Amino acid sequence: SVQGKDAKKFINKLITRNIDNIQPNQVVYALWCNEDGFLVDDGTIFCFDENNFRICSGERNLNWFEDTAIGFDVTIEDISHSIAALAFQGPLSCKILHMLNANNIENLKPFCFDQFTINNQEITISRTGFSGDLGYELWCEPSQAHDLWEALFSFNNDYKILAAGLDALDMVRI
C-alpha cells in the first residue's frame, strides 16, 4: 500500500499515466518505467481515498518503490501476506457472484471496486482482470481465501468452473 499526503504525487511519478482525477473505488491500469524509460512492470492502482492506494503487480517491486519514494511524504508497506486475491473470470462470473449474494455486483462498473458480503465475509471485489472477458478480482483476508474458493467452486457441477494459475492467465493476457 502507498499512504500519505504525497501518495498521489508519488504514484504520478512512478507510473506512465496521470491519476490526478482518480476517485475512491476506482482502479487504473498502468505501466511503470525506470529513469531511463525502460519498462519495469505493469499493474493496477486501487484508490481508497486521496491519500491511500494499493498497487497490485505480478512482480515484487518493493525496493524500487521505496527508492523512488525518497523525498515524498509517503509510507510504503508490503501487504502481500495480509491479503489474498482470486481472479474470477468468464462470461458467467457475474451470475455466479450474484448467486453467492454479492448483491448489485451487476452494477459494478469496469475498473471500479466495492465491498460485498459473501458467506458472511466482507470482501473487496474489483471489476478487473486481463482475460479480455467479463471478470472480477476478489480480495480478502488470507484466512477467508479457502472458504471463498470453496464457495466459488460449489457451482462447479452446474457451470464447469476451472482453476487456472498465473501461467495460464498470462497466455490469455491482452
Model regions and ranges:
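Basic, glycine/lysine-rich polyanion-binding surfaces/domains
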Residues: 1-174
